[in-house]
Amino acid sequence: MNKKAIFTQVSQLEERIGELHRELGGLKEQLAYLIEENHFLTIENEHLRERLGEPELEETEEKEQVTKERKPFVGEGYDNLARLYQEGFHICNTHYGSLRKNGEDCLFCLSFLNQD
């Protein structure tokens, strides 16, 4: 193989890698959007179910008490991690503490923040 053919092949490979990188970035954005949309739809679903089945007052009070007992308290640590993420740092175990590139969302960090 001559040098020109090798150079051409490397250039073509570089272009394909660039295209794949752009495509992967687009898929990552779509996935982040879908995760966020799923989270909001889940919340909306819960609210609609609550409205549809509005039980008697006593049952509602009992359910609220059980719900309060089940829900874990969101503490100061969670707030600190959310603040760090908003400031542009990773909070996932994979890249913890490093800066997020170009302020892009990290799916691992988002899944950590959206845990129930």
Swiss-Prot record:
Gene source species: Halalkalibacterium halodurans (strain ATCC BAA-125 / DSM 18197 / FERM 7344 / JCM 9153 / C-125) (Bacillus halodurans)
Cellular compartments per GO CC: nucleoid
Subcellular localization, as worded in the UniProt entry: Cytoplasm, Nucleoid
Disulfide bonds: none
Protein name: Replication initiation control protein YabA
InterPro entries xref list: YabA
Family: Belongs to the YabA family.
Main location (coarse class): cytoplasm
NCBIfam families: PRK13169.1-5
Co-factor: note: Binds 1 zinc ion per subunit.
A Pfam family the protein falls into: YabA
Named cofactor requirement(s): Zn(2+)
Superkingdom of origin organism: Bacteria
UniProtKB keywords: Cytoplasm, DNA replication, DNA replication inhibitor, Metal-binding, Zinc
Binding-site residues, Zn(2+): H90, C92, C106, C109
Subunit structure: Homotetramer. Interacts with both DnaA and DnaN, acting as a bridge between these two proteins.
Gene Ontology biological process terms, A to Z: DNA replication
The encoding gene: yabA
Purpose: Involved in control of chromosome replication initiation. Inhibits the cooperative binding of DnaA to the oriC region, thus negatively regulating initiation of chromosome replication. Inhibits the ability of DnaA-ATP to form a helix on DNA; does not disassemble preformed DnaA-DNA helices. Decreases the residence time of DnaA on the chromosome at its binding sites (oriC, replication forks and promoter-binding sites). Tethers DnaA to the replication machinery via the DNA polymerase beta sliding clamp subunit (dnaN).
